[in-house]
Structure formats: C-alpha cells, structure tokens
Amino acid sequence: MLFELPGEVNNPNANVIKAVEKLKKQEPAPLSVKAKATFIQPANYDQHLEWLKDCDLVIEAIAERMDWKRDLYTKIAPYLGEHTIFASNTSGLSINQLAEAFPEALRHRFCGIHFFNPPRYMHLVELIPCQASDADMLDDLEAFLVTYLGKGVIRAKDTPNFIANRIGVFSLLATMHHGRAFDFGFDLVDALTGALIGRPKSATFRTADVVGLDTLAHVINTMRDTLPDDAWHAHFAVPESGAFVAALRS
C-alpha cells in the first residue's frame, strides 16, 4: 500500500498512481520485476486512512521537514492499529522530537528506519529507537529487515543524522570544500574521489545526486542547526557553487 496526497476531485488517486508508474521507468530499477508494481495498492490521505489499522508496518518517507512529519503523525495516529509499527525514514531528524507528535500510548511502537537510496540496492539500514521504543518491537523489526529484505541493520542513537549521514555528509562537504580551494571542477573531483581511492564510483558529486540534492540540503541544514560546536560547523552549508545551486533548484 502506498499513500500520497490526494489529486483532483474526480481522480483522488492520481498522484499515487503517477508515483507507481514512475517506479516502472526509474533507473536503476527500484523493482526486480516491473509487473510487481500491480501489487502496490494506491491510497490517499483523504479517503483511505482507515486502511492503516490493518497494517503491521507503516513507513513514513515524506520530505525532511520536522513540521510536515509531525503534522502527518497527528493526522494518522487515530487510525493506527494496536500492534502497528510506525517508523520514519528520516535521514537525520530527531526521532525523539518526532515521537512527541504521537500520543504517549503509541510511542513504544515508533522508531526511525533509515534506508539509503536506492533502497533496493543499498544494503545498510539504520534502526533508531526513541526513548519509548519497545525493545521487542525493535528486535522483531530488525529480524524482518534482515530475513525478508536481506538488509544489514545497525542500531543508531538519536543523534543528528545518526551514523552514516553524519560521517558521509561531512566527507562530502569536506571534499567539496577542498575542491573549491583548489578550483577543481565537478568531473575532476569525482575522478579523484571515487574508485581511484577505493570508494564507490559515484564518488562525491554523483553521490550527492543519487542521494537527492533536496534531501542532501535538508541533511546539511540539520547538521548546521544541531551541531553548533563542531569544528567544521562553518562548512555545514549548501555549497554556493552556481551549478550546484541551479541543480538544487531545478
């Protein structure tokens, strides 16, 4: 089941149907078999919230905005089943602050579950509990991720950007900083920071593109807003490169 914002009045599932069709065309392919897209049940927030009560696991993956996520949680909380696990795919927002949007009685079924893009191919998943997360629930969720999805799970603390993005985005920003200092272009930076030094061939700027420039900007802003004492705080900013900013806004 996939939820989206409702479309026009005469076709409220238009947005979610468009999203499912897009899955068939994306590269690298997010589905192992394109025909399996028919297994996805389209849903929208106006008509189908009652369906949530029958779900064992609900994963939220909307934009990296604390206010948007908390508003959504407030809206859907009354419709969650007694045993439903609700998890956020946030890239680095505070899980405890997100949990505050739920009634206290539901917080033990909430946690962070951070997949990496593209999720079909990236092995790592971070599992981040809030203070109220039930230990057995976390164990069950990890078992599902490992056994049925074939993922490698790491438990992370509720710190800014968790583990992977805290290290990885710092690495990207440091590389971009030094690239600018030497007046290196995008292609040269990626040539020097990819397979040549044992890193993924996506290197630096290609990795930023795969992550999603909008998502990357939100992750950088989280570091800027929550790590004021970090030695590199001055560099926690979206690069001012004209080409980068143009790509970000396109």
Locate predicted features.
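N-terminal glycine-rich phosphate-binding loop for ADP-containing cofactors
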Residues: 1-250
